[in-house]
């Protein structure tokens, strides 16, 4: 069994869960963005007095106009001072961990064989949740690398997201996956595209080099940006089947 975490602008999908079930996996698809699901299910995500979503375009109960990129306090943040808990990512990782707990309690699930995977922003959620000791394997898709505050090699000044963070050292120590990968004990399959803008090869391999073990793989299609092909879906199925 595993948790699936969708990407930015996306939603939980029944057909995707059916596909995974046909491969032999119980799964939960967390609808963190709060978009209405295609099946017109009335009961949907309600974040209450916090809002780690991408704004009212997707989430009807959004408290902000868009994605919160920094750790600064605002009227909807948890802490009144700069804090990791003011980051959307912390809330989304907490949602991921609650999804693990949900799977653990289902009668169809072997609680000793649970994994985590997700696409793009879901890959980032995967990276931040991968330290959970209950996980036996993880597979971030096109997202989840560290070092987003570092410019790309070759002197490409301004190619990082450093200006967004304001509290850079706090971000590096508590939010960037650079702080998480050294503590991930389970096997990792990093699935990406050769031309991906969100999980570039240099950041992937630099991140995987932080792992305290050698049980990791990288799978990429060629000449494509931010999407995966049938070979990568096969990698996910085989990875989860093994662990």
Language model feature labels by segment:
Residues 1-7:
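Short beta-strand element of the alpha/beta-hydrolase
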Residues 8, 12-94, 145-159:
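Cap/lid segment of the alpha/beta-hydrolase catalytic domain
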Residues 26, 113-115, 137, 187, ...:
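Proline-centered loop/turn at the N-terminus of a beta-strand
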Residues 95-98, 235:
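Charged catalytic carboxylate motif
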Residues 97-169:
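Primarily recognizes the serine-hydrolase "nucleophile elbow" in alpha/beta-hydrolase
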Residues 166-180:
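Active-site nucleophile elbow and catalytic-triad environment of alpha/beta-hydrolase enzymes
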Residues 184, 190-192:
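Short beta-strand/loop motif that positions the catalytic acidic residue
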Residues 197, 201-243:
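Catalytic cores of secreted or luminal carbohydrate-active enzymes
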């Amino acid at each position: 069994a595993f948790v699936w975490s969708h990407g930015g602008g996306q939603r939980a999908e029944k057909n995707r869960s059916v596909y995974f079930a046909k491969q032999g996996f119980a799964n939960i698809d967390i609808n963190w963005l709060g978009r209405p699901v295609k099946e017109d299910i009335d009961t949907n995500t309600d974040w209450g007095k916090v809002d780690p979503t991408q704004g009212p375009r997707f989430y009807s109960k959004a408290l902000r106009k868009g994605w919160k990129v920094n750790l600064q306090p605002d009227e909807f943040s948890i802490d009144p001072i700069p804090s990791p808990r003011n980051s959307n990512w912390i809330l989304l990782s907490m949602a991921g961990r609650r999804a693990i707990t949900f799977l653990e309690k289902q009668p169809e699930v072997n609680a000793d064989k649970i994994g985590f995977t997700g696409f793009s922003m879901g890959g980032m959620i995967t990276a931040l949740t991968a330290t959970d000791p209950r996980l036996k394997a993880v597979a971030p898709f096109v997202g989840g690398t560290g070092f987003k505050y570092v410019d790309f090699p070759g002197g490409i000044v301004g190619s990082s997201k450093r200006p967004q963070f304001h509290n850079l050292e706090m971000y590096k120590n508590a939010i960037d996956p650079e702080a998480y990968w050294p503590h991930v004990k389970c096997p990792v399959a990093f699935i990406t595209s050769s031309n991906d803008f969100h999980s570039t090869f240099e950041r992937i391999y630099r991140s995987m080099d932080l792992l305290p073990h050698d049980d990791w793989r990288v799978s990429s299609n060629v000449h494509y940006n931010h999407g995966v092909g049938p070979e990568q879906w096969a990698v996910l199925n085989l990875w989860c089947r093994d662990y």
